[in-house]
A protein has these predicted regions:
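Short, flexible/disordered intra-domain loops and linkers
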Residues: 19-23, 55-76, 133-142, 172-176
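Short, small-residue-biased leader/transition segments that mark boundaries at the very start
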Residues: 1-8
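Aromatic-lined carbohydrate-recognition surfaces of secreted/lumenal glycan-active proteins
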Residues: 28-75, 91-97, 118-131, 162-165
Length: 192
């Protein structure tokens, strides 16, 4: 509670998946149902990643991988996943950092189309750190964050969340660049 107001309005199912992994649909369905049962039916959301070319282990020295998911395969697999979970998961905020900037529109459009098909909300999870640098990870340049947010808007998304504000965008972060990223964000959206 904050004062007399409930501050939790939904439940986040924190398990992360990207593709149709064996048992994923059943696991997310069970977790979504449990969240709904214990919360009295509050909305639930997930934030999966897209198995794009930037989906490499943070501990590796690589920035990209040779094999990545096509838009068509992503659509087919997530159609099956959404079909199995849409009655217990209300929203999906795909992480945007594993695909390249020239792929944002294609993947975002597919995500929105599938979410609409299954009556789910589609948000973006705009990563506020940069996967394009050999040192992992620094706060992202605002121009790159803006590109991702604008692609989400073009696809019809009406909500955005970010990972990871406290490290990569907060004025209180140990990274000096994080405070500057926050300032650019506020300027762009005319937030006083």
């Amino acid at each position: 509670l904050v004062g007399s107001e409930m501050c939790i309005r939904d439940r986040y199912i924190s398990g992360e998946i990207s593709r149709q992994t064996r048992g994923a649909i059943d696991a997310f369905r069970a977790m979504g149902k449990q969240c709904k049962d214990v919360s009295g039916g509050l909305p639930t959301f997930i934030s999966p990643w897209i198995d794009g070319k930037k989906a490499v282990q943070a501990s590796s020295g690589r920035l990209t991988k040779a094999e990545s998911i096509s838009v068509e395969t992503h659509e087919r697999e997530w159609n099956e996943i959404f079909d199995g979970i849409h009655d217990v998961v209300d929203a999906c905020a795909f992480q945007d950092g594993h695909i390249d900037y020239d792929e944002l529109d294609a993947f975002f459009s597919v995500n929105k189309k599938l979410a609409d098909k299954y009556g789910m909300q589609c948000w973006t999870n705009a990563e506020s750190f940069d996967r394009d640098m050999p040192i992992k990870f620094f706060p992202i340049k605002f121009d790159k964050l803006r590109l991702k947010l604008e692609a989400a808007k073009r696809a019809g998304y009406d909500k955005a969340i970010t990972f990871e504000f406290s490290h990569f965008m907060s004025p209180q972060s140990a990274y000096l660049q994080a405070g500057h990223l926050y300032d650019r964000y506020r300027e762009y959206f005319e937030i006083k």
